[in-house]
A protein has these predicted regions:
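Acidic, polar ligand-binding/catalytic clefts
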Residues: 70, 74, 78-147, 204-225, ...
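Bilobed "Venus flytrap"/periplasmic-binding protein-like clamshell domains
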Residues: 42-51, 61-76, 110, 130-186
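Extracytoplasmic small-molecule ligand-binding "clamshell" domains
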Residues: 24-106, 331
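Extended ligand-binding regions for polar small-molecule ligands
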Residues: 18-26, 67-70, 74, 139-142, ...
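C-terminal motif of bacterial Sec signal peptides marking the signal peptidase cleavage site
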Residues: 14-16
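Sec-dependent signal peptide recognition
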Residues: 2-8
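Short, hydrophobic alpha-helical packing/hinge segments within bilobed ligand-binding/sensory domains
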Residues: 31, 68-69, 92-97, 184-190, ...
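C-terminal functional modules
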Residues: 283-344
């Protein structure tokens, strides 16, 4: 009997060892390897939010979130063009990421505990600090959000914007009539057609909507900001290697701005005496190899896409239709709260 029990124990032990070995092999073949073999990154973005992600008439994508996806591609392949963009509305974004049909979601998405924990996603960081506001036509002569009692409000269902709106109106003893929309494009159409009195979403989205109006001067964003909306890219939980690649792509862009490295001077900076600059560009250290990538990981990102500040100015800054100031999205040492771990 003892001999039989010993045989059974040994068999179970061997099976357990083999199972662990199998699991280890599966874990080692992560998404980064899959992306490398496929030859491009699949990135989920907003289907139509000028300044953040939108297509022109020729089908070319541009925007702050689009630049981030291109940066991920540049860091992996040394080529920022190896990206397939998938336009998604608010209802589609999480199921599409969870299903594995996209590698990363960079779609003006707010980092919350429920999305982080319940949906089993990991946010790579914050690439835009925002807050929810209200856009109204000037002819209504509304000066404050506290005057919106009874208003017809264009709102995207099942978003943080809807939850914040409910809280704000309840706390101020007001009521509203929801006009549900599919996204910013649908909201603009309904707002400009007079189907709702006000559109509420992240302030950056309101700036984008106002810029797209036939006459932007006929629309005003009210002064109240009713929420915190830290927006950033996210990936599925359970793949630390891929999460690190996505996260440090963002951190490279922000650290590069802090170090004064731009797409215009990146080649000159290769000879910089600064140890930080050398680490960012791969002249010294092993930042790229630590992520499973090449030595020119940081260099390729900055050379082909630029640092965070360049991307901001190009897509949403004061000289664009959105005309947004850096505000909270300025570097920590220049009055903002943009602060990321060092390259060390």
């Amino acid at each position: 009997m003892k001999k039989l029990l010993m045989i059974l124990f040994t068999t179970l032990l061997l099976v357990g060892c083999n199972t662990n070995k199998s699991i280890k092999i599966e874990q080692e073949v992560g998404l980064l390897q899959t992306v490398k073999e496929r030859g491009y990154v699949v990135c989920g973005v907003n289907a139509g939010l000028p300044g953040f992600s939108a297509q022109d008439d020729a089908g070319n994508w541009s925007g702050l979130d689009v630049d981030f996806c291109k940066a991920v591609s540049a860091g992996i392949f040394g080529d920022s063009s190896k990206v397939e963009f998938v336009g998604l509305n608010a209802a589609q974004r999480f199921p599409t990421l969870a299903s594995g049909n996209i590698d990363v979601l960079a779609r003006n998405t707010t980092w919350t505990i429920s999305r982080d924990v319940n949906l089993m996603f990991e946010f790579a960081g914050v690439n835009y600090y925002d807050g929810q506001g209200f856009l109204v036509p000037t002819h209504l002569e509304i000066r404050s959000a506290t005057q919106l009692d009874g208003a017809f409000v264009c709102i995207t269902k099942e978003t943080t914007s809807e939850l914040n709106l409910n809280d704000y109106f309840a706390e101020n003893n007001m009521q509203y009539q929801p006009i549900y929309v599919e996204g910013n494009k649908d909201a603009k159409a309904k707002l400009f057609a007079g189907e709702c009195d006000v559109f509420t979403t992240d302030a950056s989205g309101l700036a984008s909507a106002r810029a797209g109006a036939e006459d932007p001067s006929k629309w005003v964003v009210l002064p109240e900001i009713i929420s915190k909306e830290p927006l950033g890219p996210l990936v599925r939980q359970g793949d630390q290697e891929w999460e690190d690649v996505v996260r440090w792509t963002m951190f490279i862009m922000i650290n590069a701005e802090e170090a004064g490295i731009t797409s215009k001077n990146v080649d000159l900076m290769l000879t910089s005496k600064s140890k930080e600059v050398k680490r960012i560009l791969g002249v010294e250290g092993y930042i790229g190899p630590m992520l499973g990538l090449g030595m020119k990981f940081g260099y390729n990102i900055i050379q082909q896409v630029g640092n965070y500040g360049e991307s901001f100015e190009r897509n949403v800054g004061p000289n664009t239709p959105l005309a947004l100031e850096r505000g909270l999205n300025q570097l920590w040492n220049k009055g903002g709260i943009l602060y990321v771990p060092p390259i060390r």
